[in-house]
C-alpha cells in the first residue's frame, strides 16, 4: 500500500471504484470468509469490514497495489479475530453450520469436494490455499493473503492436488487443477 498525499481521487471516483470492486470480488470473498468462519453472519461482517477499510484507505489517498488480495486478507484477519474473541468468550460454536456455496457456481460437485478437504487429509494451510485458488486468486495474491511466499503457496497447492487426486481419482485432475496458469496451459497443450 502506498501513501501518496497529493493524489487523492475525488470522493465520487472512490465510491465508483469500491462499487466496481464489490461487484467483481464480493462473492468470492464471502464464500471464502463463510468457509473459514462456518458462520454466515461472520462472513457478511468480514465482507463489510473489508470493503469499509478499503474505502477508508482509498479516501485517505492510499493506493492499494492488489485490491483483490488486500480484501481477502482483511476478511481473513477479521474472521480470525472473531474466532479468537469467540473462543475467549466461550461462545457455543455447535450451532454453526457449513454455509452452502452460492448458486452461481455450476460445479456443485466441486463444492462438495471443497467441503470434503479435511477428510482427504489436507492441512489447514493447504485447505486455505485451495479455497483461495478456487476463487481465482493468483499464487502471489494467495501468498499476500496468507503471509507466505509464492513458492510456498505453489508447494502447498501441489501437495493438496496430489492428495485430492489420490483420494478422488485422476478424473478430478482437470476439474480441480490448481497449477499456475502458464504451467497448466503447457501441460494441457501436449
Task: Show the residue positions of the predicted features.
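Arg/Lys-rich amphipathic alpha helix in sigma70-family domain 2
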Residues: 72-94, 106-109
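The N-cap/first-turn positions of alpha helices
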Residues: 26, 125-126
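DNA-recognition helix of helix-turn-helix
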Residues: 76, 80, 146-176, 189
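A short, charge-rich alpha-helical start-of-domain segment used by transcription regulators
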Residues: 2-31, 41-44
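Acidic, proline/glycine-rich intrinsically disordered inter-domain spacer in sigma factors
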Residues: 9-16, 20, 94-120
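Structural recognition of an alpha-helix C-terminal capping motif at a helix-to-coil junction
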Residues: 31, 45-52, 56, 65-77
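Short alpha-helical "packing" element that flanks the helix-turn-helix/winged-helix DNA-binding module
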Residues: 113, 128-130
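Helix-turn-helix DNA-binding module
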Residues: 118, 124-125, 132-155, 162-166
Amino acid at each position: 500500500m502506498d501513501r501518496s498525499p497529493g493524489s487523492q481521487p475525488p470522493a465520487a471516483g472512490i465510491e465508483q471504484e469500491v462499487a466496481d470492486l464489490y461487484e467483481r470480488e464480493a462473492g468470492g470473498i464471502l464464500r471464502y470468509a463463510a468457509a473459514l468462519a462456518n458462520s454466515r453472519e461472520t462472513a457478511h461482517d468480514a465482507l463489510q469490514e473489508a470493503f469499509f477499510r478499503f474505502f477508508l484507505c482509498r479516501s485517505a489517498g492510499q493506493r492499494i497495489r492488489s485490491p483483490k488480495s488486500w480484501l481477502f486478507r482483511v476478511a481473513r484477519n477479521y474472521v480470525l479475530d472473531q474466532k479468537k474473541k469467540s473462543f475467549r468468550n466461550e461462545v457455543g460454536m455447535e450451532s454453526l453450520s457449513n454455509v452452502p456455496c452460492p448458486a452461481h457456481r455450476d460445479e456443485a460437485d466441486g463444492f462438495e469436494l471443497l467441503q470434503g478437504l479435511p477428510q482427504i487429509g489436507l492441512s489447514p494451510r493447504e485447505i486455505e490455499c485451495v479455497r483461495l485458488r478456487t476463487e481465482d486468486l493468483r499464487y502471489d495474491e494467495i501468498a499476500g493473503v496468507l503471509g507466505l511466499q509464492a513458492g510456498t503457496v505453489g508447494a502447498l497447492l501441489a501437495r493438496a492436488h496430489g492428495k485430492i487426486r489420490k483420494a478422488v481419482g485422476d478424473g478430478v485432475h482437470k476439474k480441480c487443477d490448481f497449477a499456475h496458469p502458464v504451467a497448466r496451459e503447457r501441460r494441457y497443450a501436449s
